[in-house]
């Protein structure tokens, strides 16, 4: 029989034992948890490996999905990361894209705890993938840095997602008739290389409107604006069958700022500069020649430089027409100056012929001498010197005037005549040259014009007044009419020593100065015509829809 004192001690020991047992169980559980997690993880990895091995077990990547059965449908979409540049000379464009393809391969169905198997590019080589290629691509590059930029995913129902990062250089046919106000639709065409549409077709993943995405920040174009894109599909026939071709059109419109600064404004300023020559005097031949030649050379340089940024097309562009018309205006300004100079020279030649027409020559009439006692002495020599003879007459007249103041007029007059005739030696008169010869024409004219003019009254009465004294009346009667005839004859002698019917012209020939009528018309006609051309040109091309249609490229 157990005593009452031992009962509490037994109960206490039982409670301690239960607590120790619980502690030991907890310690055992804690020691077994890491191993169990690792085991579960090991079991999960083994499950994925088992799943992939089971998928590839007996899988032939040389055969398309549904081989021999239904058509394989490949859904595609494109995300553009960078668009540009666009080369007009090469007629191509470059862009970076994420090219996505989706199809269903029932051979890759699986059952597992994970919805999507996210795999790397190593799996791509072990399964079938579409043989998509870009029909108008000149060069396509798949990026491999730092590893091949490829994404591959398998879903439970066998749907495959395959994404690649590509840089594509594709052909862009351009018709540059409206250059630089043109717009282009650059296509990107892709399809199957080997499978006809009876085996594989392409469709858009998100429909025609949203399957191609081009963010605004992705377009880095200098000469173009990317205004949108459209998609389409078509069937192409070949000797191997009919193939489905998917096409994306990127619509580009050219920016005109560069060409306005580089070509249009310089051409307009050159034409205006060529028309400044119309306001320069037509006698300034060097200045107008420099204007014309400089502007023609400038237009030639501009036309050559404008073609550097274009392919060597065989047709004329809108810029070519503008440059050609500007060149025609500049060249016409040079031709206009040539015409002005030509007609001015003709007018000057006609004026010179009128003013320099030689006067009608008349034979010199012999001077008739009055009969007086000294006539036999003077007729002994036919070549009497007119200048010496005139000086002798003037000297005799002066002596007679001095003697008139102290003596009788009639007696001293006869004495003067005798002294005058005696004072001239016969040998001197005989040796004197002909006063009307060419050599002595100038001297004779000077001597005769130095004589005082005689009025009709003095000629008739033989009396001529003097400043210091009055001449003899008898001397004027004897020599007055002769002196008058000599002076009249000398005044009719021209510069060549010949007698002329009319005196030489006093006004100089016209120099052709002034403004030409051609210049007056050109000052109005050229600017008005050039302004009208610019108005028509810009109205036509700016209001015209120059964007290429997508249908024209198909």
Curated annotation (Swiss-Prot):
**Ranges per topology, Extracellular:** 36-259, 306-318, 541-554
Residues with attached carbohydrate: 47, 144, 157
Disulfide bridge partners, by residue number: 172-186
A single GO molecular-function term is:
GABA-A receptor activity
Q: Where does the protein principally reside?
A: membrane
InterPro entries xrefs: GABAA/Glycine_rcpt, GABAAa_rcpt, GABBAa4_rcpt, Gabra-1-6_TM, Neur_chan_lig-bd, Neur_chan_lig-bd_sf, Neur_channel, Neuro-gated_channel_TM_sf
Q: Give the UniProt record's GO annotations in the biological process aspect.
A: central nervous system development; chloride transmembrane transport; gamma-aminobutyric acid signaling pathway; inhibitory synapse assembly; synaptic transmission, GABAergic
User: How would you summarize its activity regulation?
Assistant: Potentiated by histamine.
What does the record say about its membrane topology? Multi-pass membrane protein
One Pfam family assigned to this protein is Neur_chan_memb
Q: What is the effect of changing residue 516 to R?
A: In a breast cancer sample; somatic mutation
Secretion signal, residue range per the UniProt entry:
1-35
Q: Which CDD domains match?
A: LGIC_ECD_GABAAR_A4 (cd19037), LGIC_TM_GABAAR_alpha (cd19052)
Q: Which stretches are tagged as biased composition: Low complexity?
A: 410-422
Per UniProt, 4-aminobutanoate binds at 100, 163
Functionally, this protein is described as follows: Alpha subunit of the heteropentameric ligand-gated chloride channel gated by gamma-aminobutyric acid (GABA), a major inhibitory neurotransmitter in the brain. GABA-gated chloride channels, also named GABA(A) receptors (GABAAR), consist of five subunits arranged around a central pore and contain GABA active binding site(s) located at the alpha and beta subunit interface(s). When activated by GABA, GABAARs selectively allow the flow of chloride anions across the cell membrane down their electrochemical gradient.
Fill in the subunit field for this protein: Heteropentamer, formed by a combination of alpha (GABRA1-6), beta (GABRB1-3), gamma (GABRG1-3), delta (GABRD), epsilon (GABRE), rho (GABRR1-3), pi (GABRP) and theta (GABRQ) chains, each subunit exhibiting distinct physiological and pharmacological properties.
Similarity comment: family membership: Belongs to the ligand-gated ion channel (TC 1.A.9) family. Gamma-aminobutyric acid receptor (TC 1.A.9.5) subfamily. GABRA4 sub-subfamily.
The record's NCBIfam families line, in alphabetical order, gives: LIC
Q: What is this protein called?
A: Gamma-aminobutyric acid receptor subunit alpha-4
The organism is Homo sapiens
